[in-house]
Amino acid sequence: MYVIFSFSAQPGTVSGSLSYKVSEIIVESANDAFELHWSDAEVVHYTDRIHHTVRKIAHVTEYFLLAISVSFPLYVYGVRGIWLPLLAGFLCVGFAGLDEYHQSFVAGRGPSVRDVGIDSIGIFIGILMVQFFCFLGRITIFRPLAKHKKRI
């Protein structure tokens, strides 16, 4: 949560330049890896094209990790079934809304309901992955161990 709030506290120009640098690294890495031999103008063009997408993927990734870090402990402490996505989703989406509200006080930034929706995609995927892998672990690891202990 601290990391997300720290990114949100950055002024718009700082945040934009950081994500632009990441976009530039991606384009230059692709240029080198695939030996495309793009000119500097082409690198700038492709960097501009993916910049918005990189920003939105960063949103999804941040909230994906938040959802995992919230829903996994809830699962371990017995919150399962429909209650896990409801509780973890409420906490994470609520935090996303507060984060967008927080951005309204930062220079060059503003709140966006659309960003909360994009954040919710990462939240949804993170919660589903926790449910899937924890259920899989219970079926494949812990259930056979429980049967083994009963025989002893």
Q: Which role fits each region the language model picked out?
A:
Residues 52-66, 113-121:
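Membrane-interface loop-to-helix entry segments
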